[in-house]
């Protein structure tokens, strides 16, 4: 095996997805602790604590206790190199999260055992399904009252439409939580409370049918054995092929706060989750072990460092090897650039990078020339596919306070839209400018950045738009007919794509019925 193939085989690149407050920040911290990346866990605490999350670094995040922007953290574990992408849990930032999911090879879904499947989890799972991303599930908060575990598995299957195969099974919960039973290995991993901030040696009882197990479970023993028979009869057995196809999720139980069960999840990612995979481009498929370098940008983050006012483009390496000072082609611009100062991330610790391989995430300094979806290669002209734009869910008309600044306003809105958190639309029938976003928070962010960076003051007005759909049609004649009829509701987005702005859900359903030849797309790719 070449050095490069060996390096690729070591890589595991995954994201954590969850509904806000399911415990994602805590589990991130515990994973870093497993990799000994944080000496004392407890630095990644949200909201109420004064020790702030190493992965929640932006000022607005610190104030609100939510991860707004995706952080990337790399750490070693069991002779592998783990790239962990933390995704925003706050609902306003789902686009950022969606695109992060294009940069990973697997995902860890964290569910609150007391609440089960929640809305944001459903939305994120839909995105994982678009790419058949393998999903590992962790049911968290076993140190509190949780719902019936069998009910939770049924809900995962019914709502998320994926087979659930329990790998571990909880013994009691809340004050009676005794640990978990590993179904395939026939052993009990004992829960020792109160060790959230340190790694402790795991205590294991081999075989459920043993005196030691009976003594540990006490009164719970007989009921647990019965429950287990039911579980083994009713639940799926784990099938690695089905997992790799995105059809089945292995399920683990534990408590991230109590630092219990997280190591089993990380072991599962190392043992079962895929190493970096081949990636599709418009021209061909690119293998991670190819000698020549390639990668794509899935995120741009402004002002990551208050000390240096900068923008960083996050790039997923898809093939070859990055070496300091190498030349690479910025395919969209057709230009060769020398990259001497790419960054690797240990959350807010940014370090200059000497080399990196497929699966790794590196940061490039961006002076306004790099856009989301851009491909970099070592000379070859191809573009990676599948980096999505999603239809916004909220719309506002933008009103300029100084009419003489309309040029700056257009430029500002288009440049901010390039970062991918908002989208701008220009209606065909008038000179309005409409801003679309996935959450209210983004409108505030845009207004303050327009004022700061472009010296433009704007206000927002309500507008009668329910949703946007990108229009595609193979039949020119039908498309022209549609454009004439739907003229009132048509606009062009910042990238020049024809878009239908539907005033209501009913209106959109009617249009889809009336125009079967027109495709109303809720997503489109970055080109």
UniProtKB/Swiss-Prot annotation:
Entries under Gene3D superfamilies matching the protein: P-loop containing nucleotide triphosphate hydrolases, Peptide chain release factor 3, domain III
Molecular function in Gene Ontology: GTP binding; GTPase activity; guanosine tetraphosphate binding; translation release factor activity, codon nonspecific; translation release factor activity, codon specific
Entry's Gene Ontology BP terms: regulation of translational termination; translational termination
Subcellular location: Cytoplasm
InterPro entries the UniProt entry points to: EF-G-like_DII (IPR053905), EFG_III/V (IPR035647), G_TR_CS (IPR031157), P-loop_NTPase (IPR027417), PrfC (IPR004548), RF3_C (IPR032090), RF3_dom_3_sf (IPR038467), RF3_GTP-bd (IPR041732)
Keywords per UniProt: Cytoplasm, GTP-binding, Nucleotide-binding, Protein biosynthesis
Described purpose of this protein according to its UniProt entry: Increases the formation of ribosomal termination complexes and stimulates activities of RF-1 and RF-2. It binds guanine nucleotides and has strong preference for UGA stop codons. It may interact directly with the ribosome. The stimulation of RF-1 and RF-2 is significantly reduced by GTP and GDP, but not by GMP.
Record-given protein name: Peptide chain release factor 3
Species: Pseudomonas aeruginosa (strain ATCC 15692 / DSM 22644 / CIP 104116 / JCM 14847 / LMG 12228 / 1C / PRS 101 / PAO1)
Species lineage: Bacteria, Pseudomonadati, Pseudomonadota, Gammaproteobacteria, Pseudomonadales
